[in-house]
């Protein structure tokens, strides 16, 4: 529930530097959220929350309102109220595959860090292929620790990938060693009308960096068919994979991982490197000198620097090789076609 004693400060304070049009649109969303969501129970609200705090790129302007439901029932009530009142909204997962623009975002941003966070499997099961049920809000790193602790193999390919399980499912995250879809059994989701859907992997058109889900669906969780392994061998395998990743990827810098999908002609990183752009920078955004398909924030980059660098890479690769790179990351901006998304990332 919203603290009404602080209401005037929330409604009257706006981010600096807005044009009159931006100010009107942003303040309208703040007021709308305040008026239609204020009585909801078991939801944490933050106002004018910088999204740079919630993305792995560490860039992004403030959201009109950020909501964190503390239970599944609170999430369902929030989404119902949002749909009934046409509140522009985005569901944001771990923020690992998204670039938020610098300006204020006139929308409600919903995070699932307090809900859809369960992890369970039947320890007494005699099968060598146990089923693990995971909430969409569970960080991938936590899922992997759970697997090691319970000696369950099958998801080692995800080591080093940031973000949440929900985001990993939406984009069918993976590496050269495999993808999350390979272990997926079924998904628990809300469709665009807010109806609960149980979808089996056999019914999903999963492909490269996509699970083939409708844009408006929200992942609540899923089940993964794993195999019994030894905790020691799992640790050894994950450690080996992590050493390789650290040697070839700039894991210590703020980034969103690979920026582009690999085209059929050649890996995107190889094309970018052949175009002479490895290490190239614009402002404090740089094409990584470790992996050319990664753009990193050197510490004080703005989203506009990163976007300009992405556009330059696209134009240079197309000009030299005739290949149009397709973006793997999602862009969240004040534009209306950017909102009402289930980023889950």
Swiss-Prot record:
Tagged with keyword Signal: no
Assigned EC number: 1.3.1.98
Subcellular location: Cytoplasm
Residues covered by the FAD-binding PCMH-type domain: 59-254
Biological or metabolic pathway of the protein: Cell wall biogenesis; peptidoglycan biosynthesis
Top-rank taxon: Bacteria
GO cellular component: cytosol
Annotated catalysed reactions: UDP-N-acetyl-alpha-D-muramate + NADP(+) = UDP-N-acetyl-3-O-(1-carboxyvinyl)-alpha-D-glucosamine + NADPH + H(+)
Main localization category: cytoplasm
GO molecular function per UniProt: FAD binding; UDP-N-acetylmuramate dehydrogenase activity
Keywords: Cell cycle, Cell division, Cell shape, Cell wall biogenesis/degradation, Cytoplasm, FAD, Flavoprotein, NADP, Oxidoreductase, Peptidoglycan synthesis
Cofactor: FAD
GO terms (BP aspect): cell division; cell wall organization; peptidoglycan biosynthetic process; regulation of cell shape
Pfam family membership, one: FAD_binding_4
Residues annotated as catalytic: 209, 258, 328
Enzyme type, top EC level: oxidoreductase
NCBIfam families: murB, PRK13905.1
PANTHER family given in the database record: UDP-N-ACETYLENOLPYRUVOYLGLUCOSAMINE REDUCTASE
Function in brief: Cell wall formation.
Family: Belongs to the MurB family.
Name of the protein: UDP-N-acetylenolpyruvoylglucosamine reductase
Organism: Syntrophobacter fumaroxidans (strain DSM 10017 / MPOB)
């Amino acid at each position: 529930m919203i603290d009404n004693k602080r209401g005037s400060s929330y409604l009257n304070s706006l981010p600096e530097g807005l044009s009159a049009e931006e100010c009107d649109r942003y303040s309208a969303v703040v007021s709308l959220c305040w008026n239609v969501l204020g009585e909801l129970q078991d939801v944490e609200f933050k106002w004018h929350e910088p999204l740079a705090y919630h993305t792995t790129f560490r860039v992004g302007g403030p959201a009109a309102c950020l909501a964190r439901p503390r239970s599944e029932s609170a999430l369902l009530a929030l989404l119902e109220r949002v749909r009934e009142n046409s509140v522009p909204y985005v569901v944001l997962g771990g923020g690992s595959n998204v670039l938020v623009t610098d300006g204020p975002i006139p929308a409600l941003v919903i995070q699932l860090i307090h809900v859809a966070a369960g992890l369970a499997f039947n320890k007494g099961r005699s099968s060598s292929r146990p089923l693990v049920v995971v909430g969409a809000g569970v960080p991938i790193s936590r899922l992997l620790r759970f697997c090691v602790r319970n000696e369950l193999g099958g998801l080692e390919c995800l080591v080093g990938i940031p973000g949440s399980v929900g985001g990993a499912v939406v984009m069918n995250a993976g590496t050269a060693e495999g993808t999350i879809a390979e272990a997926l059994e079924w998904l628990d989701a809300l469709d665009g009308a807010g109806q609960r859907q149980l979808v089996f992997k056999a019914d999903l058109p999963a492909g490269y960096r996509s699970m083939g889900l409708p844009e408006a669906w929200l992942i609540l969780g899923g089940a993964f068919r794993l195999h019994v392994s030894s905790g020691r061998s799992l640790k050894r395998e994950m450690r080996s994979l992590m050493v390789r990743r650290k040697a070839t990827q700039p894991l210590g810098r703020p980034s969103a991982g690979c920026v582009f999908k690999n085209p059929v002609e050649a890996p995107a990183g190889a094309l970018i490197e052949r175009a002479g752009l490895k290490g190239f920078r614009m402002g404090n955004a740089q094409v990584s000198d470790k992996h050319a398909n990664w753009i990193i924030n050197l510490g004080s980059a703005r989203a506009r620097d990163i976007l300009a660098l992405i556009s330059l890479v696209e134009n240079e690769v197309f000009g030299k090789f005739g290949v149009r790179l397709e973006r793997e990351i999602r862009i969240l901006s004040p534009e209306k076609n950017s909102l009402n998304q289930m980023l889950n990332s």
